[in-house]
């Protein structure tokens, strides 16, 4: 039995609130149960130096956690003077995932920066961030089209992500912190709305897992992501 009494395949209640802040071209509050992440998308004309003159755009991401998003206060990374390896890994993951969803030629020489700030953490912050960031990205692209900055829609498909893992010998979806911290296997999966894989991050935290268990986890992730995409579509409708 899971601590929350959810079934193995059951995700937490998922809520996506658009236009959560006033200034960003796209802004979303995404909630996976008690995990809450603010995702903003900022659209700027121009691209980084390495892309200038190539007629294509760029999408990148930054990720951070508020000091009291966790059970005990942690120092701001700005106060420490450097980002942790975990932060760098997560923001690269978010950026890679979002770039997979965008036709950079149709974006033109424009840049979208996605900022994902964890307000409250209870496991699955990176997967929640990707899910919310995708909706913020859609809103930023629609803003740019409305302004006539870009003509065609560069979005190829929606993407979403979920954590899956093996907890007390059972494959489960959307792990909260108490499960994540005790899981034998922990995996983050990013997929397109049609179920194609963008990224898999999987680690045997306690016991090595079998090929059969890997396939079981991927099926679990695919089914959960299908449900999460439905939430995205409902928010965007």
Swiss-Prot record:
Q: Which reaction does it catalyse?
A: tRNA(n+1) + phosphate = tRNA(n) + a ribonucleoside 5'-diphosphate
Q: Do you know which InterPro entries this protein is assigned to?
A: ExoRNase_PH_dom1, ExoRNase_PH_dom2, ExoRNase_PH_dom2_sf, PNPase/RNase_PH_dom_sf, Ribosomal_Su5_D2-typ_SF, RNase_PH, RNase_PH_bac-type, RNase_PH_CS
Give the enzyme class.
Answer: transferase
Q: Keyword set for this entry?
A: Nucleotidyltransferase, RNA-binding, rRNA processing, Transferase, tRNA processing, tRNA-binding
Protein residues bound to phosphate: 86, 124-126
This entry's Enzyme Commission designation comes to 2.7.7.56
Signal sequence span per UniProt? none
Q: Which GO terms describe its molecular function?
A: 3'-5'-RNA exonuclease activity; tRNA binding; tRNA nucleotidyltransferase activity
UniProt record, GO biological process: rRNA catabolic process; rRNA processing; tRNA processing
Report the Pfam families cross-referenced here: RNase_PH, RNase_PH_C
The cross-references to HAMAP family, in alphabetical order and at most eight, read: RNase_PH
The Swiss-Prot or TrEMBL record describes its family as follows: Belongs to the RNase PH family.
Describe its assembly: Homohexameric ring arranged as a trimer of dimers.
Free-text function comment from the UniProt entry: Phosphorolytic 3'-5' exoribonuclease that plays an important role in tRNA 3'-end maturation. Removes nucleotide residues following the 3'-CCA terminus of tRNAs; can also add nucleotides to the ends of RNA molecules by using nucleoside diphosphates as substrates, but this may not be physiologically important. Probably plays a role in initiation of 16S rRNA degradation (leading to ribosome degradation) during starvation.
Quote the protein name from its UniProt record. Answer: Ribonuclease PH
What lineage, starting at the top, does this entry show? Bacteria, Pseudomonadati, Pseudomonadota, Gammaproteobacteria, Alteromonadales
């Amino acid at each position: 039995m899971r601590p929350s009494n959810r079934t193995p395949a059951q995700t937490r209640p998922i809520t996506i609130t658009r236009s959560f802040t006033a200034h960003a071209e796209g802004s979303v509050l995404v909630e996976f149960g008690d995990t809450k992440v603010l995702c903003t998308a900022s659209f700027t004309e121009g691209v980084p130096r390495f892309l200038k003159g190539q007629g294509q755009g760029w999408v990148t991401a930054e990720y951070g956690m508020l000091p009291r998003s966790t059970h005990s206060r942690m120092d701001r990374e700005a106060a420490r003077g450097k980002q942790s390896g975990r932060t760098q890994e997560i923001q690269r993951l978010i950026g890679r995932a979002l770039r997979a969803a965008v036709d950079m030629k149709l974006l033109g020489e424009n840049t979208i920066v996605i900022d994902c700030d964890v307000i409250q953490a209870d496991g699955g912050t990176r997967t929640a961030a990707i899910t919310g960031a995708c909706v913020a990205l859609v809103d930023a692209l629609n803003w740019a089209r409305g302004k006539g900055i870009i003509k065609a829609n560069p979005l190829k498909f929606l993407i979403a992500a979920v954590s899956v893992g093996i907890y007390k010998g059972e494959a489960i979806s959307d792990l909260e912190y108490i499960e994540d911290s005790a899981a034998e296997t922990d995996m983050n999966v990013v997929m397109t709305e049609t179920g194609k894989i963008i990224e898999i991050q999987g680690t045997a935290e306690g016991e090595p897992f079998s090929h059969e268990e890997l396939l079981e986890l991927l099926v679990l992730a695919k089914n959960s992501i299908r449900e999460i995409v439905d939430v995205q579509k409902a928010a965007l409708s």
